Curated annotation (Swiss-Prot):
PTM entry text: Palmitoylated.
Tagged with keyword Metal-binding: no
Family: Belongs to the influenza viruses hemagglutinin family.
Subunit structure: Homotrimer of disulfide-linked HA1-HA2. Interacts with human CACNA1C.
Subcellular location(s) per record: Virion membrane; Host apical cell membrane
Residues the UniProt record annotates as site (Cleavage): R344, G345
Lineage: Viruses, Riboviria, Orthornavirae, Negarnaviricota, Polyploviricotina
Glycosylation site residues: N27, N28, N40, N144, N286, N304, N498
Organism: Influenza A virus (strain A/USA:Phila/1935 H1N1)
The protein's name in its UniProt record: Hemagglutinin
Note: Major glycoprotein, comprises over 80% of the envelope proteins present in virus particle. The extent of infection into host organism is determined by HA. Influenza viruses bud from the apical surface of polarized epithelial cells (e.g. bronchial epithelial cells) into lumen of lungs and are therefore usually pneumotropic. The reason is that HA is cleaved by tryptase clara which is restricted to lungs. However, HAs of H5 and H7 pantropic avian viruses subtypes can be cleaved by furin and subtilisin-type enzymes, allowing the virus to grow in other organs than lungs.
One function term, GO molecular function aspect: host cell surface receptor binding
Lipidation (S-palmitoyl cysteine): C555, C562, C565
Length: 566
């Protein structure tokens, strides 16, 4: 009975002992991140690195509106299709927008040679000057410049022709050889366009140009071609059996271009002095224009984000995040979020970094919870918390800065005869995209793993700091907690927290209390040993008595014969 009383007193004393615990912050966050080793780890704080939203609108890019081609495409705009007259005043733009089903291109049927390369060149042009390269009235005095019209390029119900080209025909049954030149004095590249007409019959050739064996020659420092009309009847397109092929070249500053022909020349009328801007580009989109401003435009809509990655569209104009195929890129900045189970007791699961964090500690990431005669409370360790915040903030900013190389990414242009090259290009682009995506995801996984390990290390360091101060003045009771062998008031608790705990001051009291507890343990151990021996002997006697009674009963009823020999 005495032993039982001592054990009970020991337990009550332990329950009233002053206690300090080391733990970490927890909250109601549902943010999850992935690491190299784990998926969907719930954390207290994290930052998103992946933009996945847009406004669905076409916007001004840094205050400059785009050039919307509407129902026209690049060819119709540059050649001057009469249906594209509204685009003639265009001089500058932030980017160019085509619709997927633009119907007004080259109105007279034929091939636009190297059209995809021209589109590629225009993707870096932000403005141009449209000027008369060969004035209509004075450049071709011996040729007709007004009869070259066609129903294929009608306007307002009447036959017409391109606004930037002249269809030269014979004048008074004569088409003398022409030769005209232009010297580029604009100080910038000049885009020059022209065409060659291929009649459907010799009769048409003679009707238009008089000469049967016609040619067209175009020469500059970087361009030299001679064209011969191909006379043949072809299937009707836009009610035309003839064809026109369209050509272009870029004339460098100071260079000269010379046109020579005795028939079939579709001569330049207007040309374009180009000004390049690396932020421009061409996108194909059905989105509508709105009164909004952005730094990044995609075919699906504008992105207003400073994040380093986006998964909206690979084609972008302006200062845009890098496109990746990832569905989630979230970087942890806080800790594992494992709130303690309150019902298990204040100094059970709640009190340590092993089983859970503290929702009650809101002013820091790591800290202490104490309990003594004066009460209980939380206190954050501001120094370790601030050092961790600074380190993680610098790391996140560094990652975003290194990966946040914002740029324009436009699609490459291929014609119908370059399908193999286009397919190869797609494979190469897909390969680069896969590498970018893999690098981004791996970077986030590794950094998340390092951050969570960093937090675990900080909590462990805080625990070891307390342990090294208390030494044998307290005992570890698990879950990050220490139970003092002495009374520890609030001043004492503060000294433990700030690293000024006076071990010698409390060592004598701790020694006495420790010896009392150890003595109770030893005495109770002796009693338990006596009880164990007594229990064993008593059990054996009961077993022997039971066995004797059974044997006597069996002998008395004849079930067991007993013989005693002397």
């Amino acid at each position: 009975m005495k032993a039982r009383l001592l054990v009970l007193l020991c337990a009550l004393a332990a329950a009233d002992a002053d206690t300090i615990c080391i733990g970490y912050h927890a909250n109601n966050s549902t943010d999850t991140v992935d690491t190299v080793l784990e998926k969907n780890v719930t954390v207290t704080h994290s930052v998103n690195l992946l933009e996945d939203s847009h406004n669905g609108k076409l916007c001004r890019l840094k205050g400059i509106p785009p050039l919307q081609l509407g129902k026209c495409n690049i060819a119709g705009w540059l050649l001057g299709n009469p249906e594209c007259d509204s685009l003639l005043p265009a001089r500058s733009w932030s980017y160019i927008v085509e619709t997927p089903n633009s119907e007004n291109g080259a109105c007279y049927p034929g091939d636009f040679i190297n059209y995809e390369e021209l589109r590629e060149q225009l993707s870096s042009v932000s403005s141009f000057e449209r000027f008369e390269i060969f004035p209509k009235e004075s450049s071709w005095p011996k040729h007709n410049t007004t009869k070259g019209v066609t129903a294929a390029c009608s306007h307002a119900g009447k036959s017409s022709f391109y606004r930037n080209l002249l269809w030269l025909t014979k004048k008074e049954d004569s088409y003398p050889k022409l030769k005209n030149s232009y010297v580029n004095k604009k100080g910038k590249e000049v885009l020059v366009l022209w065409g060659v007409h291929h009649p459907s019959s010799s009769k048409e050739q003679q009707t238009l140009y008089q000469n049967e064996n016609a040619y067209v020659s175009v020469v500059s420092s970087n361009y030299n071609r001679r064209f011969t009309p191909e006379i043949a009847e072809r299937p009707k397109v836009r009610d035309q059996t003839g064809r026109m092929n369209y050509y272009w070249t870029l004339l460098e500053p100071g260079d000269t271009i010379i046109f020579e022909a005795n028939g079939n020349l579709i001569a330049p009328w207007y040309a374009f002095a180009l000004s390049r801007g690396f932020g421009s580009g061409i996108i194909t989109s059905n989105a509508s224009m709105h009164e909004c401003n952005t730094k990044c435009q995609t075919p699906q809509g504008a992105i207003n984000s400073s994040l380093p990655f986006q998964n909206i569209h690979p084609v972008t104009i302006g200062e845009c995040p890098k496109y990746v195929r990832s569905a989630k890129l979230r970087m942890v900045t806080g800790l594992r979020n494992i709130p303690s189970i309150q019902s298990r007791g204040l100094f059970g699961a709640i009190a340590g970094f092993i089983e859970g964090g503290w929702t009650g500690m809101i002013d820091g990431w790591y800290g202490y919870h104490h309990q003594n005669e004066q009460g209980s409370g939380y206190a954050a360790d501001q120094k370790s918390t601030q050092n961790a915040i600074n380190g993680i903030t610098n790391k996140v900013n560094s990652v975003i800065e290194k990966m946040n190389t914002q740029f324009t990414a436009v699609g490459k242009e291929f014609n119908n005869l370059e399908k193999r090259m286009e397919n190869l290009n797609k494979k190469v682009d897909d390969g680069f995209l896969d590498i970018w995506t893999y690098n981004a995801e791996l970077l986030v996984l590794l950094e998340n793993e390092r951050t969570l390990d960093f937090h675990d290390s900080n909590v462990k360091n805080l625990y070891e700091k307390v342990k090294s101060q208390l030494k044998n003045n307290a005992k570890e009771i698990g879950n990050g907690c220490f139970e003092f062998y002495h009374k520890c008031d609030n001043e004492c608790m503060e000294s433990v927290r700030n690293g000024t705990y006076d071990y010698p001051k409390y060592s004598e009291e701790s020694k006495l209390n420790r010896e009392k507890i150890d003595g109770v343990k030893l005495e109770s151990m002796g009693v338990y040993q006596i009880l164990a021996i007594y229990s064993t002997v008593a059990s054996s006697l009961v077993l022997l008595v039971s066995l004797g009674a059974i044997s006597f009963w069996m002998c008395s009823n004849g079930s067991l014969q007993c013989r005693i020999c002397i």
